[in-house]
């Protein structure tokens, strides 16, 4: 049961009770869908285009975007669902780490959809109170503390960042860009 309360000393309104965080990320599913639509329609030739020398081809950027979701949510935070994705290596090695094995549109779409399933589950299960839970990430000799909230913000902005990067490359090629805000 939700109830809206007035906080006496601050004068702000707060929602109290159990609720998921989905409401706060309600457009993220649409962003994923827009990426799936554009990538799914691309040819293998277009997926191998690099925006510049030394940069990843489109397919690797998309694979990296999808793989980051599983790395952070499953490997770092321990969320379920990794087994339903193509990224089952807990070390964090992703498709972008093997540029000699290009991925096609079908593989990329499946990666985006299955990793979205992991994100989607978190949006349903997590409550606002859970966003402050902390987790330790050890990477080599480096040890970092992250909160659920910081990881979710990282992934949301990571998706948007790479959608923008991909859209610039697609625009230069004269291909349809990823329109995150199209409302149809």
Task: Kindly give the residue locations of the regions a language model identified.
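Short, Lys/Arg-enriched N-terminal segments with co-localized hydrophobic residues
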Residues: 9-18
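Acidic/histidine-rich alpha-helical segments that form the ligand environment
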Residues: 94-136, 150-158
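Short, contiguous alpha-helical
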Residues: 5, 11, 25-39, 45-94, ...
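N-terminal leader segment of winged-helix/HTH proteins
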Residues: 20-22
């Amino acid at each position: 049961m939700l109830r809206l309360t007035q906080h006496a000393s601050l004068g702000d309104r707060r929602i109290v009770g159990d609720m998921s965080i989905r409401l706060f990320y309600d457009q993220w599913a649409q962003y994923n869908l827009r990426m799936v639509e554009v990538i799914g329609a691309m040819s293998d030739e277009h997926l191998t285009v690099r925006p510049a020398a030394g940069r990843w081809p489109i397919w690797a950027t998309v694979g990296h975007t999808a793989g980051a979701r599983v790395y952070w949510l499953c490997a770092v935070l321990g969320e379920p669902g990794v087994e339903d994705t193509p990224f089952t290596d807990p070390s964090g090695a992703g498709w972008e780490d093997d540029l000699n094995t290009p991925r096609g549109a079908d593989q990329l779409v499946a990666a985006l959809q299955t990793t979205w399933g992991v994100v989607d589950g978190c949006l349903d299960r997590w409550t606002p109170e859970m966003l402050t839970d902390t987790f330790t990430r050890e990477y080599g000799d480096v040890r970092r503390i992250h909160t659920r909230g910081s990881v979710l913000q990282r992934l949301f902005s990571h998706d948007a960042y790479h959608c923008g990067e991909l859209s610039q490359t697609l625009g230069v090629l004269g291909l349809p860009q990823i329109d995150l805000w199209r409302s149809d």
